[in-house]
Curated annotation (Swiss-Prot):
The gene is dcd. This is dCTP deaminase. Transmembrane segments: none annotated. It catalyses: dCTP + H2O + H(+) = dUTP + NH4(+). It comes from Cupriavidus taiwanensis (strain DSM 17343 / BCRC 17206 / CCUG 44338 / CIP 107171 / LMG 19424 / R1). Catalyzes the deamination of dCTP to dUTP. The lineage of its organism: Bacteria, Pseudomonadati, Pseudomonadota, Betaproteobacteria, Burkholderiales.
Amino acid sequence: MSIKSDKWIRRMAEQHGMIEPFEPGQVREADGRKIVSYGTSSYGYDIRCADEFKIFTNINSTIVDPKNFDEKSFVDFKGDVCIIPPNSFALARTMEYFRIPRSVLTICLGKSTYARCGIIVNVTPFEPEWEGYVTLEFSNTTPLPAKIYAGEGCAQVLFFESDEICETSYADRGGKYQGQHGVTLPKT
C-alpha cells in the first residue's frame, strides 16, 4: 500500500470526479487576506469546512450515548465562523464531495493551524467505494471559546492505494453513511 502524490490526486479528481469541487493547487489567500490553506498538497488534499454546524450543548443534561444519540444535544448554526464553547465540540461537513475508488483507503488528519490552538479535528477513514460529504468533528480542548472558519482548510486527506482490490467495499456492505449529505449524526 503506497501513499498517492499530487499528480495522482489531480488526475483522479479531474478524470473520475473523486473530489468535487476540486482545487488543483494550494489556496492560502482569499480577497487579499490570509486563510487556513486548502487544496492539493504534495501527498494529500486539504479539505474545507462548509458553513453548516451542529454545536454540542448541555441544555438538556442528557447522557451521550452513541447507540441512542439525542439530536436535542445540538444547536444548529449556519455562518462563516462557528464559536465552539470551552471543552465542547461541534460537527460540520466538508465543502467537498468524495468518491473513493475501490482500491483506495484514506486517512484524514487535522491541520496543525487548529491543533496548535487546542482544536482537534477528528474524521474516520474514507473506505473503498465510500462516497459523500465528510462529517467533521471539531473538539475544543481549551477552557476558552474557539473559532472554526467555514470555507477554509481544516484537515488533510491522505490517499493510500492497495496492491490488490478488496473483496468487499463499503458500498458492497451497504455502509450506513454511504452518500451522506449535510452533517450526519451517529447511526447504529
